[in-house]
Amino acid sequence: MRLAIMLSATAVAINFATSSAIDQTKVLVYGTPAHYIHDSAGRRLLRKNEENEETSEERAPNFNLANLNEEMFNVAALTERADAKKLAKQLMGNDKLADAAYMWWQHNRVTLDQIDTFLKLASRKTQGAKYNQIYNSYMMHLGLTGY
């Protein structure tokens, strides 16, 4: 009789321990720290980004990275809305220019907060949501997403 009670109590304890361990793994899988780095990161990654490679190639077919002015990527120095909007539109329209900007930002340790401020300056009405592709691509360049 005691053996049956001990076996059933052991089975209940093992079942309880495994079910609580499974719940913890679900929390660890779904709660990645990449989304907690910046306040708007979770919202930005949920939006769909549509890219059309044909139009981006038509906009700048003869782009030369050797002719770049490095200071054009300095988002911390941008204070005028028109300059920020111009840079954001250029980055949206040209993948090679955007990649060069991401490398420059990473080398100069530009934070996601600075990028978010720059994008909010570029489009005040939508609080930077218009240029989510730039923010998301920079996060992917830094390796902060699961892609």
Swiss-Prot record:
Position of the signal peptide: 1-21
GO cellular component: extracellular region; host cell cytoplasm
InterPro entries: RXLR
Segments carrying motif RxLR-dEER: 44-59
Keyword Acetylation attributed: yes
Localization in the cell: Secreted; Host cytoplasm
Keyword tags: Acetylation, Glycoprotein, Host cytoplasm, Secreted, Signal, Virulence
Record carries keyword Signal: yes
N6-acetyllysine PTM positions: 48
Induction notes from the record: Expression is induced during host plant infection.
Positions of the record's site feature: Cleavage: 47-48
The protein's role, per its UniProt record: Multifunctional effector that can suppress host BAK1/SERK3-mediated immunity through at least two different pathways. Manipulates plant immunity by targeting and stabilizing host E3 ligase CMPG1. By preventing the normal 26S proteasome-dependent degradation of potato CMPG1, and thus potentially of its protein substrates in the host cell, Avr3a further abolishes host cell death during the biotrophic phase of infection. Also associates with and affects the function of the dynamin-related protein 2 (DRP2), a plant GTPase involved in immune receptor-mediated endocytosis.
Additional facts recorded: The AVR3a protein of Phytophthora infestans is a polymorphic member of the RXLR class of cytoplasmic effectors with dual functions. AVR3a(KI) but not AVR3a(EM) activates innate immunity triggered by the potato resistance protein R3a and is a strong suppressor of the cell-death response induced by INF1 elicitin, a secreted P.infestans protein that has features of pathogen-associated molecular patterns. The 2 polymorphic residues between Avr3A(KI) and Avr3a(EM) are localized at positions 80 and 103, respectively.
Family: Belongs to the RxLR effector family.
Subunit structure: Forms homodimers via the RxLR-dEER motif. Interacts with host E3 ligase CMPG1. Interacts with host DRP2.
Name of this chain's protein: RxLR effector protein Avr3a
Taxon lineage: Eukaryota, Sar, Stramenopiles, Oomycota, Peronosporales
Gene behind this protein: Avr3a
